[in-house]
Amino acid sequence: MPKILVLYYSTYGHVESMAYAVAEGARAAGAEADVKRVPELVPEEAAKKNHFKIDQKAPIAEPKDLLEYDGIIVGAPTRFGRLPSQMANFWDRTGGIWAQGALIGKVGAVFTSTATQHGGQETTLYSLMSSLLHHGLVISGLPYSFQGQGRLDEVTGGAPYGATTIAASDGSRQPSKNELDGAKFLGKHVAELAKKLTAQ
C-alpha cells in the first residue's frame, strides 16, 4: 500500500478543503494518505485581524516527514502568480534532503486556489512543481480523463498541470463539486502511479 502525503498551506480554507478531497481520492485508490500543513509565518494577531482560518486541524509538517512517503501532493494558494512564502519557506528547509537525493523517484503533484479564473493558476502550479522537480520527483498532472476539465457550463477550476479552485476576490466562493471531484481524481491518480512505482 503506497503512502501519500498531502502537504498544503491555506489562508482562508479553500486549499484546506481541496487537500482533504485529494486525500480522499488517494484513499479510494487503496493508499494510506496523511494531510499535513506547513507552518504559518504571519504573526497570529495579524492573521486574526485579516480573517485567516487559524483553526485548521491538520498537523504541522517537518521536512523529514517527506522521507516517509511514496507520493507527495502539494497545494497552496497563489501569491501574485506564484507560491506563497509559507510554502517556499518549507521547501527552503529541505536542502539536506535534496543533497541526499532522498526524494528521487517519488510521485509528485500540485493543486492551487486563485481569486479569479485568470489569477495565476497555471504559473502558481508551475512554481509549486519547481521544488518537486529539483528533488527528482516524477510529476503527475491532472489528465483529461478527468471529464470535469472540459466543462463549459459553469465557472470552474482545473488544469492539466493540477487541480484548482476559484475563491473569488473576497474569498466567498468555496470549492465546487466539480473542483473537489478534480482534487479527488488527482489524489487517486497519484496513488495509482505510486502503487505501480513501488511495485517495481
Curated annotation (Swiss-Prot):
Gene Ontology terms for molecular function: flavin adenine dinucleotide binding; FMN binding; NAD binding; NADH:ubiquinone reductase (non-electrogenic) activity; NADP binding; NADPH dehydrogenase (quinone) activity
Binding-site list for NAD(+): 12
PROSITE patterns: FLAVODOXIN_LIKE
Amino acids binding FMN: 10-15, 78-80, 113-119, 134
Gene Ontology cellular component list: membrane
Cofactor notes: Binds 1 FMN per monomer.
Keywords (A to Z) from UniProt: Flavoprotein, FMN, NAD, NADP, Nucleotide-binding, Oxidoreductase
Cited InterPro entries: Flavodoxin/NO_synth (IPR008254), Flavoprotein-like_sf (IPR029039), Flavoprotein_WrbA-like (IPR010089), FMN_Rdtase-like_dom (IPR005025), NQO (IPR037513)
Annotated ranges, domain Flavodoxin-like: 4-190
Reaction catalyzed: a quinone + NADH + H(+) = a quinol + NAD(+); a quinone + NADPH + H(+) = a quinol + NADP(+)
Essential cofactor(s): FMN
Positions contributing to substrate binding: 98
Top-rank taxon, per record: Bacteria
Alphabetical list of Pfam families matching this protein: FMN_red
Family: Belongs to the WrbA family.
PANTHER family: FLAVODOXIN-RELATED PROTEIN WRBA-RELATED, FLAVOPROTEIN-LIKE PROTEIN YCP4-RELATED
Protein name: NAD(P)H dehydrogenase (quinone)
Gene it is expressed from: trpR
